[in-house]
Structures are given as structure tokens and as C-alpha cells.
Amino acid sequence: MALSSVEPTEAPRATGFGALTLGSIGVVFGDIGTSPLYAFREAVHVAAEGAPVTRVIVLGVLSLILWSLLIVVTAKYVLLLLRADNNGEGGTLSLMALGQRALGRRSVPLLVLGVIGASMFIGDSMITPAISVLSAVEGLKIAAPALQHYVVPLTVGILVALFAFQRWGTAKVASAFGPVMVLWFSTLAVLGLLHINDDPSVIAAINPWYAVEFMLSHGVIALVTIGAVFLAVTGGEALYADLGHFGRKPIQAGWLFFVLPSLLLNYFGQGAMVLAHPDAVENTFYRMVPENLLVPMILLATAATVIASQAVITGAFSLISQAVQLGLLPRFEVRYTSETHAGQIYLPRVNMLLLAGVLLLVLLFHSSSALAAAYGIAVSTTMVVDGVMGFVVVWKLWGWRPAAAAALIIPFVAVDAIFFSANLLKLMEGAWVPLLFGFLMAMLVWTWRRGSAMLILKTRRTEVPLPDLIRSLEKRPPHIVRGTAVFLTSDPEYVPSALLHNLKHNKVLHEHNVILTIETAQTPRVDLADRVRMESLGDKFARVRLRFGFMESPNVPKALVIARKLGWQFDIMSTSFFVSRRSLKPAAQSGMPRWQNGLFIALSRSANDATDYFQIPTGRVVEVGTQVTI
């Protein structure tokens, strides 16, 4: 279940190795840890095609699940990609930035891959809460069959409450995530151990020959089954995405010594139970639970799926925030839900869109079995993307020869490609849903990038080079007023439009003028020593560049305090910040199709105010409006 390109989710910061490992169990593995609710059941259903379940099917599916977890999650992510960190951070956009840094330039193919991976995550992040909570609540069908009609309404209620809760943040409850998930995984292990005794011969599925035999004997159905088996590894990419919060070794320890054994024990327990009691295949997970413990188990499963969903939601907020910083999307409103952890953020518009998408899926598909067909295509796409970008890192950054790097990465990409192909077979059954969401997301990114580039070209024609203006003002100085004026601009080589308008309409110039540019680095964070760069342009002008990492929240006043230490006499109370606000109008002749032009204008108008985004005191801001046709 996909934290696919999940860009790191926020978790309570802990310092000790044990605390970090516990924290990782609560956040990193919540997604993949709820897969036993439906993964084995769906794979067996697909393989059997309505016929009686055979021993070949059970052992074949179990062997496929085992070796998928070992190859895709353990070998690729835990042992390989966790080492490919970008200043300690992981995730698709971090990997993209790392690859571009390794190449020493902005690579269009890598950018496209990064956008595809991020877009697929947004599409998949709507399915994860829906299928997770649905699968947990469906336990009511066994505990109290008369309540089965309340499964969907109850699921909707839980999801609405979950998304409504986002505005208050998770800081107060996040500390409970680890213990709850430890209880969950321990329960999985105990249930599995108890039921392996139903048919101990199920252990034979450790032999990969059973997976091979199943694929050879079932033809096309085997490929379709692989698509269902993939449900067991979705969420594995979250191990890499959350690298920055917990570190490589705690995640590796949590996976290798606790989570992976618990998952395998549970899957093998489900398999043994089906071999002994074939009718249990209807809902293999809840049939493992003693009848008198069904209700507590449903409550625990619901808590686990809510935690897994929370990780995805937080990951979506983090991903969108990074995309904004990298210039892939307009500035969305960001609210900070914690005074101590800058990474705990809430994006109201994104939250509403996610909730709408999740509820639409629940009401459209009604059950986790139906949603399973829609699940996996986005994660498998992201895994292919991670593999390809991982090749660039191994080759360019780690210094491997191309042949050696290919020999290492190609087997993983080949396995990912098989899963991708298998999930494509489910296209008409529902896999089109995350693809549609991902396509819409990619369309927004493409439109914003294309429109922004055209806007720069459009305004460049009328802009004045900054050195030319300074020379002109030295020859004909205007009236000088006391104080400092800071002009925000995206291009420090040209005169900000707000400065031109101030000179044109007010006929004044401040005694100190700062041309301020805010840049986003290709690293998650920037050291304070590299935050500020100052350049004197004469007695009245200075050029200041502020650099932030793509995972940082840009705070201009705090950054300018650093400038004071570099010699700039800066007083916030005698400083005015001049911000240009462009009003876009559609041109008769545009370089984009009319629909895309209109979409770009709508995105531009929806962007959050620069004053709020850069956390500038509103009482010190002067906004200057300009109208631009595009």
C-alpha cells in the first residue's frame, strides 16, 4: 500500500537507536504492515478463478509473496536504496534531486521520471486509506453478519474524521503509533504461529521452485496472480521515503528482525489454515482470529489502518510541499501544526482533494476486494522509476562502471517491470483510477512548468538589467527616503517590477535597497553557513540570495537575521518588503492551447500569497500589482 513516492512522513523525533526503531515501526511499516488483511486472500482468489483452492495454488502464492518481499523490499530498498540518501533524506523527489546533482546538471529525463513517480504517489495515496480502512471494517461481516450493510457508512465516517483531524496535527498522538504497531505486528506473528500448526508442510513454500512451478502451470493466470501478490509489497518503498526521519540502521533493524518475520509468519499461517480448511479462503485473515477476540481484533486492525493512512496523508503533504519548493507546483497554503517540528504541516486544499478522492473510491467500489483491482499500478510505476534513477546514482555518484551498475540494477528493474505488466492487466477492472489521478497530477505539473517558463520569457522582454538602472540612478538620483526596501524577485540580474513601479509612481528611492532572491537547492536542507550570500552593488544597492533546501520551509525574516551577522545593518521595523503581484490575463495569441492557458491562470490565482508563504510580517509588506497577458 503505497507510500510509494512518499516523501518523508513526519514522526516524533527520537534520539536513541531503540526509540528510532520503535518510531520507524509506527510510521514506516504501517502501510506494508496492513497488507495481510487482504493480500493473500486476493492472490488466492485470482489464482483459483472460482475453482477449489489447490495445494499448488497455496504454496505457489506463498512462495511468490515470500520471494517478492525478499527481492523487492529487502534487497532493493532495505539493503540497496537506503544507502542512496540525499543528505540523509530519501524518497522519489530526493532521489531525482540526487541524480541531477550526480549528473552536474538539470536532466530533463530525470525530471520527467521524478514527476511521474510523484504523480503516481498522489494517485495511490487516495487508494491506500480507502482499501486499508475498508479491509479492517469488513471484519464486521464475520463478527456480526447483520452489520455488513454498515461497513461502507462506518468506513466513510472513520475517513472523514481522519481527514478532519489533520488541521490539528499528529504531534500529540504520534507517540502512540509505535506501541500500537508493535502490538499489531506481534499479533500478526502470534496468529501465524498458531495456525502454521494447521498444516506445517506449508513451510515448503520457502523453496522458490513452488513459485516457478505455479507460474509455469498457470499461464496468463499466473501473471494476473502476480498483480495480486504485489499487494503484499506495496508500501515497501516507504522504507526509503522515511529514511530522513529514522536513519538507515533503525529502519533496517526494524524490518529484518521484527516486521519481516511477523509478516511472513502471518502469511504462512493463512496458507496453512487454507490448506486445512479451504472454506477459510473467504476472509483468511479474520478466520484466523478466535471468535471471542474478533471485536478487539477489528478495533486493532482499524487502528493500524488509520495509522497507515495517516502516514500516507502526511507523506502527501510533504511531497506537495517539496514539489512547490522545486517549482513544480504553485505555492499552496501551508499551515504548521507543531511549534517544535517544522515538518509537521497541513495543506488545506490538498487535504480536501485527498478526502474527496478517497470517499469517491469507497462509494464507487464498496469493498476492499473490488479496490484491490485498482491497487498496485501506481506503486509498481514508482518502483520502476526508483530503480532507473537508482542506476544513475550507482553509476555517477558511487562511481561504478556502467556495466557493473547495470548488472546490479537491471534485475531489480526487471522484477519491477513484471509487477508493472501484471498490474496493467487490471487496467479495465479499476487500475485506471490511480493512473487517472496520476495523469491529472502530471498535467498540473506540466502546465505550471510550461506556463512559468512562458511567463519568464514574456516579462523578460520588458525588464531592465539591474546594472543599467543603478548607473542611471547614479546620474539622475531621485528623492531619497530613509529606511531599507527589500524587493523580492526570481531573477536577481534584472530590476524587480516593484522597484520600477516605486520609481515611476512614487518617484522615490530608499537609502538602502536589497534585491532579494530565494533559491531552492538540490539538497533537502542547507547549512546555515550557506543560507545567505550577499553582494554589494554600490552605496544604495545590495543583492542577497537566500538558499533553502527543498524540504525546508522558507522563512525570510529568520534568514535575514543571518545577514546581520555578515555586516548588513538590518532592522525589521524600519524595513519594507516590496512584493510584485501579477494579474494574468489570457492573450489572443498564446503559446499554449486555450485550455492549458486557462488552467495556468487558474493555478496562478490559486497560489498562496508570497507574504504568507515566505513568512514575512504582513505589516511590513507593500504589494505592487501588475497585469500581464499570457
From Swiss-Prot:
GO MF terms held by the record: potassium ion transmembrane transporter activity; symporter activity
Top-rank taxon, per record: Bacteria
**What's the name of the protein?**
Probable potassium transport system protein Kup 2
Catalytic activity, as annotated: K(+)(in) + H(+)(in) = K(+)(out) + H(+)(out)
Task: Name its species.
Answer: Rhodopseudomonas palustris (strain BisA53)
Similarity section: Belongs to the HAK/KUP transporter (TC 2.A.72) family.
Its gene is kup2
Does the record carry DNA damage as a key word?
no
- Predominant location of this chain? membrane
Gene Ontology CC annotation, any one: plasma membrane
Q: Where in the cell is it found?
A: Cell inner membrane
Please list every transmembrane segment annotated in the UniProt record, as residue ranges.
14-34, 56-76, 108-128, 145-165, 176-196, 214-234, 255-275, 293-313, 352-372, 375-395, 402-422, 427-447
Keyword set, alphabetical order: Cell inner membrane, Cell membrane, Ion transport, Membrane, Potassium, Potassium transport, Symport, Transmembrane, Transmembrane helix, Transport
